[in-house]
Amino acid sequence: MIYDFKAEIIKAKNSSFSKSGSHHWLLQRVTGVILALCSFWLIYFMFTNKNNDINIIMWEFKKPFNIVILLITVTISLYHSVLGMRVVIEDYINCHKLRNTLIIIVKLFCILTIVSFVVAIFYSG
């Protein structure tokens, strides 16, 4: 019994998600660094407002700098989670149709969450 490695390599190359592993690795690291930097802001914000009333905290969140950093934090964290979930799904789900469906569902969920967050931030009274 000789295992046909060429057939497996061809099958892997023809997969829709086997484009560039190094690009995916780099994106995972870059989003991780951005999240680490944003977490410093979040920790600072929490400690400086720990004794404040909820109205003061909401007023602080409505400042443009804080809105931008919060949007970056949520967007990058969801994108980082999409990258991680994609790797897990590709590694552990063997059925190609189920794999592709789950990846699309995860992406749609994260897009819907980001859009909902943006709407909630900009349309809160």
UniProtKB/Swiss-Prot annotation:
| Pfam families membership | Sdh_cyt
Which parts of the sequence bind heme? H80
Cited InterPro entries: SQR/QFR_C/D, Succ_DH_anchor, SuccDH_FuR_B_TM-su
List locations, semicolon-separated. Answer: Cell inner membrane
Q: Name one GO cellular component term.
A: plasma membrane
Q: Which regions face the Cytoplasmic side of the membrane? A: 1-24, 90-99
Listed GO MF terms: electron transfer activity; heme binding; metal ion binding
| Transport found in the keyword field | yes
Q: Where are the transmembrane segments?
A: 25-45, 68-89, 100-123
Give the signal peptide range: none
Q: Tell me the cofactors it needs.
A: heme
The pathway noted for it is:
Carbohydrate metabolism; tricarboxylic acid cycle
GO BP annotations of the record are: cytochrome complex assembly; tricarboxylic acid cycle
> By its UniProt entry, which SUPFAM superfamilies does this protein fall under?
Fumarate reductase respiratory complex transmembrane subunits (SSF81343)
The cofactor note reads:
The heme is bound between the two transmembrane subunits.
Job description of the protein: Membrane-anchoring subunit of succinate dehydrogenase (SDH).
> Quaternary structure?
Part of an enzyme complex containing four subunits: a flavoprotein, an iron-sulfur protein, plus two membrane-anchoring proteins, SdhC and SdhD.
Protein name per its UniProtKB record: Succinate dehydrogenase hydrophobic membrane anchor subunit
Species assigned in the record = Rickettsia prowazekii (strain Madrid E)
Tell me the lineage of the source organism. Bacteria, Pseudomonadati, Pseudomonadota, Alphaproteobacteria, Rickettsiales
